[in-house]
Amino acid sequence: MSNQDLVLLERLENGAAVVTLNSPKVNALSTQLLGRLLEVAQELTATPAGAVVITGGDRLFAAGADISQFGGADDARNIGAAFHAALNAVADIPAMVIAAVSGYALGGGCELALACDYRIASTKAVFGQPEILLGIIPGGGGTQRLPRVVGASRAKELMVTGRQVKAEEAVRIGLADEVVEPEELMVRALELAGTISSGATVAVRIIKRVVNEGIETDIASGLAGELAAFEEVFRTEDSQVGVKSFLENGPGKAAFTGQ
């Protein structure tokens, strides 16, 4: 299998895109797969989609790093760098990124889900950071992104025990945002991606950017960023279309152009 086939990118007619992890058996996140994921994320940044769905297929999301590539400290540095480059690129995709988690999302797979903006879990989904069971720590962003999602105390508990979290608990603690039956997973993910893609996608990208920047700074700086972005969005064609449509036809009827 070529590196190109390890991660597939499909652009849909409605403007959304689907990214499919396609590594044999368990979608082990090898450095080769991560390199291809980085390329795909960079393409989705250079030529944005309306929204992005990341899936590992019907059976699982991703079972974690490719343990066969683990060796000494030099290997760890290279693997960690590959994870950071790829997952940071996923997090930096301008569009909303939706993780459709069908089964196991463990280790690096959980870290990939955490790099997404919204996580939809199948009832069969299982999340976890089990690195402690190998005597190591998460190296793909887990020590930083997991506390930001579930809080520091819960994140520490999950990482120091390595325990697995099923879908219902994942929603309860904020690790997943909603749970659906397995056969409804991609239907729901594509429905949400389609809804976002049919809306004011420039404003969507601005919302994502301002929220992400704001949670990393103090409230005053965040509000200043919001004010600048509020002015910025009023320069878009979509804002003119939306306001005009609201005044003439009421809410929810604007035909946005993405400009």
Predicted regions and their residues:
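Conserved hydrophobic/aromatic "anchor" residues
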Residues: 41, 61, 93, 127, ...
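C-terminal alpha-helix plus adjacent terminal tail
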Residues: 1-14, 23, 44-47, 162-168, ...
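A general structural signal for well-ordered alpha-helical segments in protein cores
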Residues: 34, 54, 67, 83, ...
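Conserved CoA-thioester-binding segment of acyl-CoA-metabolizing enzymes
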Residues: 1-55, 88
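Short strand->helix junction
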Residues: 26-27, 60, 178
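Glycine- (often His-adjacent) and acidic-residue-rich active-site loop
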Residues: 6, 33-39, 47, 56-89, ...
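Crotonase-fold acyl-CoA enzyme core
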Residues: 91-202, 232, 236, 241-244
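Terminal peptide-recognition signature
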Residues: 19, 37, 54, 66, ...
